[in-house]
Each structure stands twice: as C-alpha cells, then as structure tokens.
Regions:
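Post-HEXXH active-site segment of zinc metalloproteases
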Residues: 73-89
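Metal-dependent nucleotide-binding catalytic modules
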Residues: 24-27, 32, 68-69, 91, ...
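Short, solvent-exposed segments of well-ordered alpha helices
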Residues: 5-8, 28-32, 104-108
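His-Asp-centered metal-binding catalytic motifs of divalent-metal-dependent phosphohydrolases/nucleases
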Residues: 55-72, 115
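Post-HExxH zinc-binding segment in Zn-dependent metallohydrolases
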Residues: 84-103
Length: 162
C-alpha cells in the first residue's frame, strides 16, 4: 500500500499533455504520443540549429501542449477551415497559458519546419508506403523549399544520408 503522503493528487498538465495521441484520424499511421512528437521536434531543432536559443527548444517542447484541452485536430482540417484553425489556435494558447507555459512564437519558420519535418519523418519511419500520396509529396517539396530559405539544405541532405 502506498502511504497517503505519497499519493499523487494531481499531475502537472504539461506532463499530462504528453499522453495526447496524435494520428488518431489516420488509422494507417501508428499512434504517436505528444511527448514523443515534442521530443523529436526538439531533436530536429538541435540537428539543424545546434546553437539555437533556448526559446526555440522551449517552443519545440511545448508547442502543442494546449492539445490536452482542445485535442489534436489534423493540419489538413485546419488548412481547409481557417476559421476553425484560428479558434483552435486561440483556445490552445489559452490552455498553454493556464498551464503556465510562456508565450511561444508559432510563426518562427524554424519551428514550423521542425514540426512538419517531424511529421514527415514519423510517417517515413512508420508508414513509408504513404509517402507517395499527394499530401506527403507536397510536404517534402515544402520542406525542401523551407530548407533553402532557412539555409539548412545541406543539413537536410545530411539527415537522409545517415
């Protein structure tokens, strides 16, 4: 029996948010926890920008924590409905603030790149047969363009050559 002084009454919501499941609307892609996603986005950030500022790593590790409250709505749905996307962005920002998470710059192109690249890499790792679908063909083209813009094209080549 666990002594009463060791009972956990409440787990921090930042930690709990790591249990949110991604890819639930794509049954052909295995489930991924938000903690796994955040950790991999941080790994990608450090691979491409090894001397980045702490705020970018902080953003990588917390950018989707608000999904604990609003859920993980797939990007294509948000792309199809800008009004929904704006409402979800606001609700996620409020949820992150209530969790005590500092304001995150979701418009930082490095975070956008790392987030998309993590999704692409996860699908490549777990469901590579899907990479020929138009959405993933567009994604890798977009990532190539972003890598050029961010001056990390050689790092992108290095990523795939290991």
């Amino acid at each position: 029996m666990i002594p009463p002084e060791h009972h956990v009454v409440e787990i921090n919501p930042i930690y709990r948010s790591g249990s949110v499941t991604r890819w639930h609307t794509y049954p052909e892609v295995p489930a991924q926890s938000l903690a796994d996603h955040h950790g991999r986005v941080a790994q990608i950030v450090l691979f491409f920008w090894p001397n980045c500022e702490a705020s970018l790593l902080y953003a990588a590790l917390h950018h989707d924590c608000g999904e604990l409250i609003v859920g993980d709505v797939p990007k294509p749905r948000k792309d199809d409905d800008p009004e929904l996307a704006a409402l979800l962005d606001l609700r996620e920002a409020v949820a992150r603030a209530e969790m005590g998470i500092d304001v995150i710059d979701h418009n930082d192109p490095r975070l956008i790149f790392a987030d998309l690249f993590e999704a692409y890499s996860y699908v490549a790792l777990t469901s590579h047969h899907l990479l020929g679908e138009p959405a993933w063909v567009r994604a890798i083209a977009t990532l190539g363009e972003m890598a050029d813009m961010l001056d990390v094209s050689q790092r992108l080549v290095d990523w795939f050559s290991r």
